[in-house]
Curated annotation (Swiss-Prot):
EC number(s) stated in the UniProt entry for this protein: 2.3.1.225
Protein name in the entry: Palmitoyltransferase ZDHHC18
Domain text: The DHHC domain is required for palmitoyltransferase activity.
Single GO BP term: negative regulation of innate immune response
Compositional bias annotation for Pro residues: 27-40
Protein's organism: Mus musculus (Mouse)
GN (gene name): Zdhhc18
Gene Ontology cellular-component terms listed: cytosol; Golgi apparatus; Golgi membrane
Membrane topology (Cytoplasmic): 1-82, 133-227, 291-380
Keywords: Acyltransferase, Golgi apparatus, Immunity, Innate immunity, Lipoprotein, Membrane, Palmitate, Phosphoprotein, Transferase, Transmembrane, Transmembrane helix
Null mutant phenotype: Mice were born at the expected Mendelian ratio, develop normally and are fertile. Mice display increased resistance to infection by DNA viruses due to increased activation of the cGAS-STING pathway.
Sequence segments annotated as region (Disordered): 1-59, 355-380
């Protein structure tokens, strides 16, 4: 077999002469199309540095949020995972108010005064505004520990020699206004909870100044939306009492010259309003009074139920370190002042190194920093 000789041809050189017996080549065939990516394979877009990146659109942080919340309008609005009870709240408020404006307000405006529908409209819009702000506002969720911070805990678990070992619950103690306060470690969020912070089992988030999880508003009630929640229940009690009184007045005026049953037959919708308001007003008024006491004492529902600063659990009563010893000052501290910013960057983009929740490796060079003493020690 003859050795093949390869000769580099310059671009401007003429082609070599063909042998007499050789066949003249036909037109060159078009190049075969390059095979596309397999179905389901990621599409890569090249960059100037030579390192490819995923061609799909970048994800925002609300799309990979670890809690059980639902986000709307591109992450601008958030709600708890379950919204059935919240929908029932909207249905009761809207249906009762619409029936009142359709069947009672025209008669009362003609007979008594035009101020009745105006007052009802102002109360209704204020109630709906406070409800929507309570439901769609971040209650004060604290972001979870980063991968590197969580890797310190995983490394501590690996050093024990057992894959099923979990260190016991750890606490830290801090002094607040001369009172010792214990900070518990959250194994879900991988951090020590700040004072008055608790982990909501429904939303699966640590919420700052956690009051309670309210299914009626479809959200947790915490530091960033408690003022809206208090304004909602207070204004709702006024609206319910106002509609109840107006419906009773309407039926009383209709029953003049006839019996009360005849008045009920004339406006059956008013009967439905009367029943809804009668069974709702007691719980709403009681809830408003209870939270008025909490605001005046600078307490939360969680602290009151647990008896953190009282002798409800049989222990010694201690002084509330968050109280300012004045009702007016406590009310201003809870309800007034600037709204703290949200600590979760819902609209931010997921970074490439933290986009996927891959298994945590304690030997990752990016996590080579020594863990903080607060992460591995029981006390500071």
């Amino acid at each position: 077999m003859k050795d093949c000789e390869y000769q580099q041809i310059s671009p401007g050189a003429a082609p070599p002469p063909a042998s007499p017996g050789a066949r003249r080549p036909g037109p060159a065939a078009p190049p075969a199309p390059s095979p596309g990516p397999a179905p389901g394979a990621p599409r890569w877009s090249g960059s100037g540095s030579g390192s490819g990146s995923l061609g799909r659109r970048p994800r925002r942080k609300w799309e990979v949020f670890p809690g059980r919340n639902r986000f709307y309008c591109g992450g601008r609005l958030m709600l708890a995972g379950h919204g059935g009870v919240f929908a029932l709240t909207l249905l009761l408020i809207l249906s009762t108010t619409i029936l009142f404006f359709v069947f009672d307000c025209p008669y009362l405006a003609r007979t008594l005064t035009l101020a009745i529908p105006i007052i009802a409209a102002i109360l209704f819009f204020f109630v709906m505004s406070c409800l929507l702000q309570t439901s769609f506002t971040d209650p004060g969720i604290l972001p979870r520990a980063t991968i590197c911070e969580a890797a310190a805990l995983e490394k501590q678990i690996d050093n024990t020699g057992s894959s099923t070992y979990r260190p016991p619950p750890r606490t830290r103690e801090v002094m607040i206004n001369g009172q010792t306060v214990k900070l518990k470690y959250c194994f879900t969020c991988k951090m020590f909870r700040p004072p008055r912070t608790s982990h909501c089992s429904v939303c699966d988030n640590c919420v700052e100044r956690f009051d309670h999880h309210c299914p009626w508003v479809g959200n947790c009630v915490g530091r960033r939306n408690y003022r809206f929640f208090y304004a909602f229940i207070l204004s709702l009690s006024f609206l319910t009492a106002f509609i109840f009184a107006c419906v009773v007045t309407h039926l009383t005026l209709l029953s003049q010259g006839s019996n009360f049953l005849s008045a009920l037959k004339k406006t059956p919708a008013s009967v439905l309003e009367l029943v809804i308001c009668f069974f709702s007003i007691w719980s709403i008024l009681g809830l408003s009074g209870f939270h008025t006491y909490l605001v005046a004492s600078n307490l939360t529902t969680n602290e009151d139920i647990k008896g953190s600063w009282s002798s409800k659990r049989g222990g010694e009563a201690s002084v509330n370190p968050y109280s300012h010893k004045s009702i007016i000052t406590n009310c201003c501290a809870v309800l007034c002042g600037p709204l703290p910013p949200s600590l979760i960057d819902r609209r931010g983009f997921v970074q490439s190194d933290t986009a996927l929740p891959s298994p945590i490796r304690s030997d990752d060079p990016a996590c080579g920093a020594k863990p903080d003493a607060s992460m591995v020690g029981g006390h500071p």
